């Protein structure tokens, strides 16, 4: 996805409901991100501009333009123990085949009272194949982050918004653009408004996790 969709999703986008919720969550925690920041699975670093920091280190598991570190986070992050103030990891955990190993490495490199902001799917179509391994529940996060002293888990969109997003994806994939485009706008508007009126956390498309070491 282009940077614009991450940073400024529009009502005409077939990913609007999903990405607008991620963006809202990121902005809500932006003031907690500080000091030396490690962005895991950084890609184009779409949310970097929302943070205030002293140093920003980007990490990917493959060579990518502008990336500082290439490493497998399930084995070892090539940084010293307790050297990082903040870790961010957006829409990546579902693509990591050993998520507990990755979370343990995040915990190792974080300073005491360091923070980790992570987002990932609860429900989404298969993507990034063949490396699409998991979908997560709050209980999975509590287990994965059990070494951290504090873990805050939030839904990113309620049941109505999430179901509407899945419908939008189906329409976008199957119908001609001349038909799908106006339908997507209508469904995006309905999904956003209805979710505020009859919000239910029992099903969500995405979660954010904010953990403190």
Summary of predicted features, one role per range:
Residues 4, 12, 97-101, 105, ...:
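S-adenosyl-L-methionine-dependent methyltransferase catalytic module, highlighting the catalytic core
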Residues 60, 212-213:
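Residue-level signal for short segments within beta-strands and strand-turn junctions
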Residues 88, 96-97:
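Short, solvent-exposed loop/edge-beta patches enriched in aromatic
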Residues 90-93, 119:
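Residues lining the SAM
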Residues 1-82, 86-90, 103, 201-207:
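Conserved N-terminal segment of class I S-adenosyl-L-methionine
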């Amino acid at each position: 996805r282009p940077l614009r969709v991450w940073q400024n999703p529009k009502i005409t986008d077939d990913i609007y409901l999903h990405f607008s919720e991620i963006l809202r969550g990121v902005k809500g925690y932006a003031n907690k991100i500080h000091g030396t920041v490690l962005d895991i699975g950084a890609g184009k670093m779409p949310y970097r501009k929302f943070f205030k920091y002293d140093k920003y280190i980007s990490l990917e598991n493959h060579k990518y333009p502008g990336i500082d570190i290439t490493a497998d986070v399930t084995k070892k992050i090539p940084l010293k123990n307790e050297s990082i103030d903040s870790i961010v990891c957006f829409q990546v955990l579902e693509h990591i085949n050993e998520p507990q190993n990755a979370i343990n490495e995040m915990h190792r490199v974080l300073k005491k009272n360091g923070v980790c902001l992570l987002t990932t799917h609860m429900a989404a179509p298969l993507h990034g194949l063949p490396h699409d391994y998991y979908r997560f529940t709050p209980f999975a996060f509590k287990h994965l982050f059990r070494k951290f002293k504090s873990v805050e888990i939030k839904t990113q969109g309620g049941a109505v918004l999430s179901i509407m997003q899945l419908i939008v994806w189906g329409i976008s994939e199957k119908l001609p653009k001349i038909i799908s485009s106006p339908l997507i706008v209508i469904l995006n508007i309905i999904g956003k408004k209805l979710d505020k009126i009859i919000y239910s956390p029992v099903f969500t498309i995405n979660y954010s996790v904010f953990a403190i070491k």
